[in-house]
């Protein structure tokens, strides 16, 4: 127990120590100030902007910014789709893996351009090295950079006033990749290689075991993909077992680096925001609320797994319980990680839009599985994905400002800018579109017989598997309850739709809100005298409960039919 507490404290301290320097660095990068990586990144940026021409030089309005973002994503989608369909005839395919079917290729392409990395295929048998490196790994970089661009555009809109532009998407995209994601990923990949993660393009090895049987040992460019998988909060594993596989996550050190990587940029953006708007206290308040939500989620999930079998009344289990005095749920977990390393990793990955796992979520107790769902359903605002976590949290922040101001009889304003009805429309659109998508698609899937045939469990747990799939897809997480066999035409297409709606529906609302905020006048005197204090402890509590009430209660009826009912069923075994 003491070692678990030390690990947790070390993790939190590491994230806190990273936040300010990395946040300041991100601020300098996007504010066109000198950085210590200019010598490395500028040559790449010059070539990139030279190819783009004039489109990368002019500042863009919100509509133009969104149009550029969607145009880029469409091109990326077509690029990935074609490679996946044709991978059987492309080079670097020593295992002679065939091209995907169209529904599966469509699902996978959508998954990677939306930073979801939902996988209805097994990585070691479904994708060639060429497709892994040129299609999927590239999207791990640029899809994360797209989310970062949206967050930066939103931050600019708060900091600027009485103007019409929020930056240039193409310029921001290059900065996100060349100054931030690529350099850090190179360092992480080198560390992974030294820790034993393979990085090659060899054919799979066929070895004879001591038992006289043949075993196939997969190979591949794993370290490079694993680095950006976590840093870019992508989560798509090179192997079907994801970070439970010893080639993806061989040591406690790689496990720790992956967890820190997932939260690093998301945490840093809170300081970037505070520094950019001239109020670092505001940034630290956001960090604090995120941290409290994370701790609560981790505690509930860990206790559920450490004591997940204590309530079972089976005689056989009671006999074991009587012998050991305590029975934790180790099903689906790596013995080298144990319960706490597993719950910590999976709380991190479901709080962010990462989706990587080092244990099987479908084997978790219903209450622990519910916490994973809730982390995603509230919009993954507990630090969250690269960029996506910040702009998702900002929507709740705006709602809390609006509610709090009206409660005390003041005109809603945030950092000197009036919050008007149109702003709240975009805010609520961003907050509700993913949840509506989840409820509609889950309801449809629950009454379709062909979907029932893909389940390995029935009843409440079977419903939980369906619900988890659409929560994960719509919130661009990508993790799954493994009991759902997702490679069917219906699930491939509907989960792809949920990923598209959850990604670009929210981004559209966020950018439109940014376009509204950037045009407003900014009066700091008005903010100080007649508005809600948005850096106070009381406001932090208001934001906390706004997230729980709006995000949590909306999905609560569905959770009641799934994991809550599943937990109650277990209690009466």
Curated annotation (Swiss-Prot):
Is Metal-binding given among the entry's keywords?
Answer: no
Segments traversing the membrane: 6-26, 66-86, 135-155, 177-197, 257-277, 283-303, 382-402, 428-448, 493-513, 537-557
Q: Which GO terms describe its molecular function?
A: P-type potassium transmembrane transporter activity; potassium ion binding
Q: Carries keyword Ribonucleoprotein?
A: no
Q: What InterPro entries does this protein's entry cite?
A: KdpA (IPR004623)
Q: Where in the cell is it found?
A: Cell inner membrane
Family recorded in the similarity comment = Belongs to the KdpA family.
User: What is the official name of this protein in its record?
Assistant: Potassium-transporting ATPase potassium-binding subunit
Q: Which organism is it from?
A: Francisella tularensis subsp. tularensis (strain WY96-3418)
Lineage, please?
Bacteria, Pseudomonadati, Pseudomonadota, Gammaproteobacteria, Thiotrichales
Query: Which gene carries the instructions for this protein?
Result: kdpA
